[in-house]
Structure formats: C-alpha cells, structure tokens
C-alpha cells in the first residue's frame, strides 16, 4: 500500500473554515430552552427544604447570566467553532504546549458516561463502589508494572499537581528523618517542565537549575558540582521538552543517591518510552504519569486530568490518603498505610477523577 504523506496536506496546507461566529451569549434569545427540567417529585420536594434552607448570603439576588438557547443552535455554534480549529481529531500530530497527545478513543467516553459511572458519588459507602474501586486498584497495579514502582495514588488532578505530590513526598520523607531543614535544595534542568521547579518551590525548596552541555544533554560536570549534603532530590523530565533523551540518566540518579538524596521522574513525555524502559530501572524513587497524555484520556480542554503519582515501598506511607487496598474479599479505602505524622494527607478532595482512571484502564486493557 502506498504511504500517504499527510504533512503538506494537514499541517502546512490546512485551510480552516471561516465563520463570522458570535460568542454564545450573543445568540441567546429570551425564553428559548435547550432542555426542560422536570419539577421535583412532590415527595422529594416535601423531604428537601431546597433554597429555603440556604443562608441568605448564599442566595442569588438575580438570575445567573446564562445564555438561553436551543439545542440545534448550540450544536451549530460549536460545530462551526470546531471547523475553525486544527484539533486532535483532524491531525493527531497537533502539539499542545510540549505535549505528545495520544488518540483518545471515543468509546471510552461512552464507557465513562454510563449511568453506573456517571451517577456515582464519592461519598457513597464503599460497599456500593466495589466496581470502580477494583478498577482503580488494578490500574494502580498496571502503573506499578509499567514504571517499576510499588504503589500509586490517582488523587492529583493534573501534571503540576502530580509534581507537587512528588515534592510533598520528598518533604515528608526528610521530615520523618528530622532532616527537612538540611535537605532544602532541589536540582532540575532548564528544559524539564517548569512545574519541576515551581512545585518544589511552593513546598519551600531552593531550586538549582542545570543547563545543557554542548551536546544538549544535562551537564554532568555541573551536576556533580551541584550535588551536596543539602540536596533533597533531583526532579527531571526525560526526555526533556527538547525531545532529547538523556541516555546517561542512571549516572545522575546514582550520584544523588550516594549523596543521600531522592530522585523524582516527571514522565509527562513518557509516550515514547512505554515498554522500553522504566522509571525504577533508571534509579528513580518516584514518578508521575499524565493519564490525560500517556494513557489516552482527553487532554487539556478536552477533559479533566490525572497526574498519577507512584513511589517505592519505602515512600508509600507518605502518599495522599486514602489509598485503595484489597483484603482478599473486598476493596476498601486504606487510611492505615498512610497513618503517620509525616504523611502528606490530601492533594485534593476525595480520591481523584475516577472517569479518567476508568478510561486509562480501558486503554491499557
């Protein structure tokens, strides 16, 4: 079969539609509706006080500024906007920042939108959530196999929050050893994601930036000079945002470990490495994956995110609570594993974005 060269047709030769499309608020017509909401059942209305139970300061003084618009008009509006965009459905090679974006199977969106998933509530009793808890537990097992780590948390809801989770693990580890004041420096490279510096800075660490050598790799001699008794951890994306993979990364992680530090792997650029190498094999103590990049769930404005954080057995007790465990008969929210004064507690409410984990599970399977 003849290979089709789409580069000139899609990227440089792309001709987008041009619509003089108003913003959706300008399409609003008073009294127009896209859906008619049923009135509450009398028994429900009687049992629930509704607005009258709200304190006065929470009650609106006027109606919200929402467009009044029919379904066909909404459909045409967003279809026209989509025609003006070179999106992932038109060309999978589209770049979003430094991201390598996978195809997000549409069937997975349908799966996540099933009533059994969509209508669940995070405060349900765990006995009624065994299905999704099993999926989250097993997805964590898959992540461990892919990365070489021992335990994962899906609580962080994005890449930067995943890096913040790793920075929190680093701080918790040294706090448990009484070394949090001494170990106050994080080394990262200038071509790693900016969050690899920003998130540890939020946790109070001093950031040491590493520049590349003449070959584009992180400068190892400069790295050796930077590592000392104050080094808490090495945070790095590999490959970096230049697309260059540091084949000598094991030398870097070994040096940090010899100095008593930890190594954290930003795997936002992991698409090209799956099945080739693993974070643990490269000497890292923790890592995170963007499920919304590497495991096919929609990225950016296409949907919610998850920055899954994994770590070694030694660091497991510091992970966000609760974890999900299995006792041989049922899955349960595990607060005991992380029940220690140094544990980082919560990164966000509840246990992460469950539909994102479900989509990643389906893609892996």
Map each language-model feature to its residues.
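Conserved PLP-enzyme active-site core in the AAT-like
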Residues: 131-134, 161-332
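Short, hydrophobic/aliphatic alpha-helical segments
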Residues: 74-90, 139-149, 289, 332-341
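Gly-rich Lys/Arg/Thr-decorated short loops/hinges at beta-loop-alpha junctions or inter-strand turns
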Residues: 58-59, 114-127, 145-147, 201-208, ...
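Short loop-beta-helix segment that forms the pyridoxal 5′-phosphate
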Residues: 128, 141-168
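Short acidic-aromatic active-site loops that bind/stabilize oxyanions
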Residues: 67-71, 125-137, 156, 160, ...
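Structural motif of enzymes handling amino- and sulfur-group chemistry
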Residues: 332-365
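N-terminal glycine-rich, Lys/His-bearing helix-loop that initiates the first secondary-structure elements
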Residues: 1-119
């Amino acid at each position: 079969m003849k290979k089709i060269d789409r580069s000139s047709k899609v990227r440089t030769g792309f001709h987008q539609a041009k619509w003089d499309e108003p913003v959706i608020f300008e399409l609003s017509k008073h009294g127009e509706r896209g859906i008619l909401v049923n009135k509450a059942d009398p028994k429900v209305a009687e049992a629930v006080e509704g607005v009258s139970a709200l304190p006065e300061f929470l009650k609106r003084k006027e109606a919200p500024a929402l467009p009044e618009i029919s379904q066909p008009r909404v459909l045409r509006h967003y279809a026209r906007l989509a025609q003006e965009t070179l999106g992932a459905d038109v060309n999978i090679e589209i770049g979003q920042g430094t991201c390598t974006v996978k195809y997000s199977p549409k069937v997975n969106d349908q799966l996540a939108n099933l009533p059994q998933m969509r209508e669940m509530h995070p405060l349900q009793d765990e006995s009624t959530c065994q299905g999704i808890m099993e999926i989250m537990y097993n997805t964590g097992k898959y992540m461990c196999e892919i990365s070489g780590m021992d335990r994962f948390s899906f609580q962080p809801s994005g890449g930067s929050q995943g890096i913040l989770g790793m920075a929190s693990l680093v701080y918790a580890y040294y706090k448990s050893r009484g070394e949090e004041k001494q170990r106050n420096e994080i080394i990262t490279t200038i071509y790693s994601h900016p969050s690899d510096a920003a998130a540890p800075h939020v946790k109070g660490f001093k950031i040491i930036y590493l520049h590349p050598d003449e070959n584009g790799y992180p400068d190892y001699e400069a790295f050796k000079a930077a590592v000392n008794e104050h080094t808490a951890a090495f945070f790095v994306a590999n490959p970096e945002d230049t697309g260059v993979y540091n084949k000598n990364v094991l030398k870097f992680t070994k040096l940090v470990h010899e100095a008593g530090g930890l190594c954290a792997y930003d795997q936002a650029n992991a698409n090209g490495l799956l099945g080739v190498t693993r974070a643990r094999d490269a000497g890292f103590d923790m890592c995170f994956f963007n499920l919304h990049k590497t495991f096919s769930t929609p990225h950016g404005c296409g949907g919610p995110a998850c920055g899954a954080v994994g770590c070694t057995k030694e660091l497991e007790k510091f992970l966000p609570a609760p974890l999900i465990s299995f006792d041989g008969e049922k899955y349960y929210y595990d607060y005991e594993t992380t029940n220690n004064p140094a544990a980082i507690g919560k990164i966000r409410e509840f246990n992460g974005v469950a539909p994102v984990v479900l989509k990643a599970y389906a893609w892996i399977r």
